[in-house]
């Protein structure tokens, strides 16, 4: 069994980056979290075969070092959307429309598109998604016996955070870092409490609605000293400093890409109207078949004849107008 360096304090993990990895893990991409240093890397089929062979060999030889991040199942995705609609949406018509979308094909993308047409519901979704994702990640880390602290939860200076990463495996450090390590150890125990998985609702009267100002989290640089050379080109290092940058979409990697799609492509309402028009057209074809136009050719003639009749009605009117003009002259 391979022996690995032992970290001298809980691993500093970025919860927003983990949320992004959890949402992007699918049939084409596998994400892994390192137990030794806490870095994330992912494997997809776009990489060179030689590099893929090397990283798979690394995973096989050091299987106990890396944890495969779980993939969202179809049931879990549907459950997330249904829970949000039932718990957070109060308008009956809007709720019915959301539930209709949840049951449809390609529900995940349609759900987001419809959501972005309702600003109030969008803000509630963002908060709901972050809270539920955080609980899911903490539960997974606990089940895999990680000792960790989310960097976004700390009030340390950037310098201290980076020094903790540089000296992660050093037993002897300065007094300042020794104190910081003790604070990290105390903080890490909070994630193993019951409240971490069941946050208490805030008591008292809700605050007055005001303009929402989202402060970006100050994060330190990525400093990893024990990354195997074969894993370096697979590292997952997105710079996510606010929850609004996260996306639930399975087709787009960032919120900016998804919004660009909404601005450039057709809206959900247009797609629904097109679907309704298509259904009515099919019903008309069925009706024509019942009237005796059963074959494909006859069905086509039925529509063509109707169109020709309209043209014949228009032509006499044009000749009449021309005749009047000549008589006046």
From Swiss-Prot:
Entries under Pfam families matching the protein: UPF0158
Residue ranges, annotated region (Disordered): 292-329
Record's compositionally biased regions (Basic residues): 317-329
Domain of life, source organism: Bacteria
InterPro entries: UPF0158 (IPR005361)
Biased composition (Acidic residues): 295-313
Similarity comment: family membership: Belongs to the UPF0158 family.
Name under which the protein is recorded: UPF0158 protein CT_429
The species this protein was found in: Chlamydia trachomatis serovar D (strain ATCC VR-885 / DSM 19411 / UW-3/Cx)
Biological classification of the source: Bacteria, Pseudomonadati, Chlamydiota, Chlamydiia, Chlamydiales
């Amino acid at each position: 069994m391979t022996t690995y360096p032992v970290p001298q304090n809980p691993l500093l993990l970025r919860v927003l980056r983990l949320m992004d990895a959890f949402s992007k893990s699918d049939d084409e991409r596998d994400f892994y979290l390192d137990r030794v240093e806490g870095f994330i890397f992912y494997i997809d089929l776009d990489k060179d075969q030689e590099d893929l062979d090397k990283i798979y060999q690394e995973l096989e030889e050091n299987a106990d070092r890396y944890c495969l991040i779980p993939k969202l199942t179809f049931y879990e995705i549907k459950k997330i959307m249904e829970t949000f609609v039932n718990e957070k949406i109060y308008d009956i018509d809007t709720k019915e429309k959301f539930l209709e979308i949840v049951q449809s094909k390609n529900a995940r993308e349609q759900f987001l598109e419809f959501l972005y047409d309702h600003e109030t519901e969008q803000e509630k979704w963002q908060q709901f998604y972050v809270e539920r994702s955080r609980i899911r990640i903490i539960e997974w880390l606990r089940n895999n016996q990680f000792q960790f602290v989310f960097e976004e939860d700390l009030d340390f200076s950037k310098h201290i955070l980076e020094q903790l990463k540089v000296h992660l495996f050093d037993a002897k450090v300065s007094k300042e870092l020794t104190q910081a390590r003790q604070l990290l150890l105390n903080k890490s125990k909070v994630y193993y409490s019951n409240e971490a998985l069941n946050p208490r609702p805030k008591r008292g009267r809700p605050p007055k609605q005001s303009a929402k100002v989202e402060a970006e989290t100050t994060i330190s640089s990525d400093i990893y000293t024990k990354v195997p050379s074969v894993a370096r080109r697979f590292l997952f290092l997105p710079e996510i400093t606010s929850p609004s940058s996260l996306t639930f979409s399975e087709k787009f990697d960032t919120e900016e890409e998804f919004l660009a799609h909404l601005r450039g492509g057709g809206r959900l309402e247009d797609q629904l109207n097109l679907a309704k028009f298509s259904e009515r057209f099919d019903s008309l074809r069925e009706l024509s078949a019942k009237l005796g136009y059963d074959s494909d050719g006859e069905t086509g003639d039925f529509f063509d004849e109707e169109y020709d009749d309209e043209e014949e009605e228009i032509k006499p009117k044009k000749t009449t107008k021309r005749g009047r003009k000549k008589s006046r002259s």
